[in-house]
């Protein structure tokens, strides 16, 4: 089938790569315009554009798409069967969605209608979901409201973070796109609606995955150890706190139970109830910090101006003091 691919970040590249290697014809790629790097004003292409250019696929980077008559004319002239969309970065208007013969299809990284919106992977980890997945839906004007053609679930492991789960869902999206396109192709002469499921058919709670903002990245030590652990994984590697007025990105922690502290004979301050307090500095183990519930052990972090460091290195860099607070 003749396909126009819409995508921008690294997350989208695997699907483009798999489709390029298939029997389908990728007639063009639409991606976000080059962005200026924060330093040096050098323009940086999107990962999707880099891959498409390497593979000699025509690339379009429109600044605007809504009411862009010239661009819409180009899309019509390309006469494609499908638009395949994954993390393009802008909402497509109906005038564009309806151009392909067999409509426009999107891979969404959640089990719809749970986590419609911009940050489904982050929110699935933040909320402690045990499963997630990918659904291929026919696009419509509403935000992630389309009917679902194919879907597959995967388990969210306890140690999954944004990086690992994103990789799993990117791979899964590429797999499901092939299956969905095959279903569409095999049913070209039938009513595709017979294969689609309404999102309400799944009997799931509707939730919205709003965009992550700067405040979301700040660790609140008055939260439970479990909530802090989820935040660090969900917003990897950018969840942060401050110590001695310096920013510290927390990369990896371990929740310590009372049993484990007693079993390993860790020497810590006892009868301490203030969250965010350093209660233990243990050589070859690390810094132990209080939360609303269990204490946590700091395994990896990045102090501003430094590289990611582990336990003993962090003790040397931070020069921490038992009884002092993070975020003070």
UniProtKB/Swiss-Prot annotation:
The keyword Glycoprotein does not apply. It holds the Pfam family Formyl_trans_C. InterPro entries: Fmt, Formyl_trans_C, Formyl_transf_N, Formyl_transf_N_sf, Formyl_transferase-like_C_sf, Met-tRNA-FMT_C, Met-tRNA-FMT_N. CDD domains: FMT_core_Met-tRNA-FMT_N (cd08646), Met_tRNA_FMT_C (cd08704). It catalyses: L-methionyl-tRNA(fMet) + (6R)-10-formyltetrahydrofolate = N-formyl-L-methionyl-tRNA(fMet) + (6S)-5,6,7,8-tetrahydrofolate + H(+). Transmembrane segments: none annotated. GO terms for molecular function: methionyl-tRNA formyltransferase activity. Keywords: Protein biosynthesis, Transferase. Its EC number is 2.1.2.9. SUPFAM superfamilies: FMT C-terminal domain-like, Formyltransferase. (6S)-5,6,7,8-tetrahydrofolate binds at residues 110-113. It is an enzyme of class 2 (transferase). One of its GO terms (cellular component) is cytosol. HAMAP family: Formyl_trans (MF_00182). Attaches a formyl group to the free amino group of methionyl-tRNA(fMet). The formyl group appears to play a dual role in the initiator identity of N-formylmethionyl-tRNA by promoting its recognition by IF2 and preventing the misappropriation of this tRNA by the elongation apparatus. Belongs to the Fmt family. This is Methionyl-tRNA formyltransferase. It comes from Prochlorococcus marinus subsp. pastoris (strain CCMP1986 / NIES-2087 / MED4).
